[in-house]
Amino acid sequence: LSGVFYFCNMQVSRFLLKFILNIFPPLLFNRIVLKEISDDFLEMRVVLRRALFNMNFHKTIFGGSIFSACDPYFPTMYYHIFANKGRKLIIWLKSAEIQYLKPADSTLKLHFKITEEDILIVEEKLDKEGKVEIWHTVNAINKKEIVCAKARMQVYLRDDKQKKNLGF
């Protein structure tokens, strides 16, 4: 099943998953585009284009659009990484925080990365406790390679078999 992944309990290709995320209205209307998904789902590259729909009064990208560009990717990556291992998990973005460091007056690039070490930590805690929360950071970088925003996301993962025994 190489190159095939699951989306909403449907088996889809990486290409189709990318297409579905790119036409999802909250991302589409904010001009957020998923450009690349690595074969192993450990990395995703996203672009947030400055456009009429996402500009604020100062003609920079609205902070809510930047925050939206950070939202769905880490949980999606974890879902597919573990689905490829045959492990069904319940995954949520539990918490998020963002720091706006500079006005975003151009297109922003975001690189989401999960390391092999992150996967080992998650697997170990899932095996011992049935659930885990892990933090990740992503930077929103403008065309001059300046970090305009830094977001931290807390991803909650729980073994699906234990959903009745564990709380959120």
What are these regions (language model features)?
Residues 29-61:
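Catalytic strand-loop segment that frames the active site of acyl-thioester-processing enzymes
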Residues 29-34, 94-100, 121-123:
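Short structured motifs
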Residues 2-29, 51-53:
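Alpha-helical membrane-targeting segments
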Residues 77-116:
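Hydrophobic beta-strand-centered segment that forms part of the acyl-chain substrate-binding groove
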Residues 104-105, 115-168:
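HotDog/MaoC-like acyl-thioester-processing domains
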Residues 47, 53-76, 88:
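Hot-dog-fold acyl-thioester-processing enzymes
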Residues 46, 94-96, 110, 134-136, ...:
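Hydrophobic residues positioned within well-ordered beta-strands of beta-sheet architectures
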Residues 15-21, 46-53, 82-95:
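Short, charged, low-hydrophobicity "junction" segments
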